[in-house]
Amino acid sequence: SVPPPVYGCHTPTDSCTGSQALLLRTPYNSDNLYQMTSQLECMTWNQMNLGATLKGHTTGYENDNHTTPILCGAQYRIHTHGVFRGIQDVRRVPGVAPTIVRSATETNEKRPFMCAYPGCNKRYFKLSHLQMHSRKHTGEKPYQCDFKDCERRFSRSDQLKRHQRRHTGVKPFQCKTCQRKFSRSDHLKTHTRTHTGKTSEKPFSCRWPSCQKKFARSDELVRHHNMHQRNMTKLQLTL
């Protein structure tokens, strides 16, 4: 859940959403800041202009000697432009306190964007990766094949491109040893092992806790991981 705005300008009410009230000050450490930004993006799915909210509350900060606001100034937007290493959704503004910038820069957190879907705590380095992942939960498939009589839809643009090669016959991945061509890079990698003698090689390992399965192809690992995720979701729903 979104961290409580105990150091915010005001307490959330029916007329003021929690995201608007999360105008945090320095008592929040860098870990809280990472959580706050990732949750805001995950819950709103769009850019937020909080300038109007800030205008009504920054005037009282000048006389506050105990804490300095992390975000101060008349306007800012939460969107994809990093100011802290690993954070992609806070715009660089003059009012960011230098001590907070250093604290966040020194953190070891590499994946600040966490999925808020119940039972799923997957994290991503980029907001766009989180948005792609979220479509697995929502079932959204915005990319549609425009070939005649097909109309198949996909959640990711690269999936659509890979699918369309079935229609066009394009095989852009060529083996350097025998010049055989493939429509997918992972199929080429699997084929290449027939030349190197490493046909039993399985370089893709499952990172799910207590699972040590390995696979020869990345798409096999993806299907296997999705199985874990479905089982986890079912378990959460029964609790």
Swiss-Prot record:
Gene3D superfamilies: Classic Zinc Finger. A motif (9aaTAD) lies at residues 43-51. Residues 157-171, 183-191 are annotated as: Important for interaction with target DNA. There is a cross-link at residue 234 (Glycyl lysine isopeptide (Lys-Gly) (interchain with G-Cter in SUMO2)). GO terms for biological process: adrenal cortex formation; adrenal gland development; branching involved in ureteric bud morphogenesis; camera-type eye development; cellular response to gonadotropin stimulus; diaphragm development; epithelial cell differentiation; germ cell development. InterPro entries: Wilms_tumour_N, Znf_C2H2_sf, Znf_C2H2_type. SUPFAM superfamilies: beta-beta-alpha zinc fingers. GO terms for molecular function: DNA-binding transcription activator activity, RNA polymerase II-specific; DNA-binding transcription factor activity; double-stranded methylated DNA binding; hemi-methylated DNA-binding; RNA binding; RNA polymerase II cis-regulatory region sequence-specific DNA binding; sequence-specific DNA binding; transcription cis-regulatory region binding. A zinc finger (C2H2-type) spans 113-137, 143-167, 173-195, 204-228. The record marks 214, 220 as: Important for interaction with target DNA. It holds the Pfam family WT1. GO terms for cellular component: cytoplasm; nuclear speck; nucleoplasm; nucleus. It is found in: Nucleus; Cytoplasm; Nucleus speckle. Its main location: nucleus. A motif (KTS motif) lies at residues 198-200. Keywords: Cytoplasm, DNA-binding, Isopeptide bond, Metal-binding, Nucleus, Repeat, RNA-binding, Transcription, Transcription regulation, Tumor suppressor, Ubl conjugation, Zinc, Zinc-finger. Interacts with ZNF224 via the zinc-finger region. Interacts with WTAP, AMER1 and SRY. Homodimer. Interacts with WTIP. Interacts with actively translating polysomes. Detected in nuclear ribonucleoprotein (mRNP) particles. Interacts with U2AF2. Interacts with HNRNPU via the zinc-finger region. Interacts with CITED2. Binds to DNA motifs with the sequence 5'-GCG(T/G)GGGCG-3' via its C2H2-type zinc fingers. Starting from the N-terminus, the second zinc finger binds to the 3'-GCG motif, the middle zinc finger interacts with the central TGG motif, and the C-terminal zinc finger binds to the 5'-GCG motif. Binds double-stranded target DNA, irrespective of the cytosine methylation status. Has reduced affinity for target DNA where the cytosines have been oxidized to 5-hydroxymethylcytosine, 5-formylcytosine or 5-carboxylcytosine. The 9aaTAD motif is a transactivation domain present in a large number of yeast and animal transcription factors. Transcription factor that plays an important role in cellular development and cell survival. Recognizes and binds to the DNA sequence 5'-GCG(T/G)GGGCG-3'. Regulates the expression of numerous target genes, including EPO. Plays an essential role for development of the urogenital system. It has a tumor suppressor as well as an oncogenic role in tumor formation. Function may be isoform-specific: isoforms lacking the KTS motif may act as transcription factors. Isoforms containing the KTS motif may bind mRNA and play a role in mRNA metabolism or splicing. Presence of the KTS motif hinders interactions between DNA and zinc-finger 4. Belongs to the EGR C2H2-type zinc-finger protein family. This is Wilms tumor protein homolog. It comes from Sminthopsis macroura (Stripe-faced dunnart). The gene is WT1.
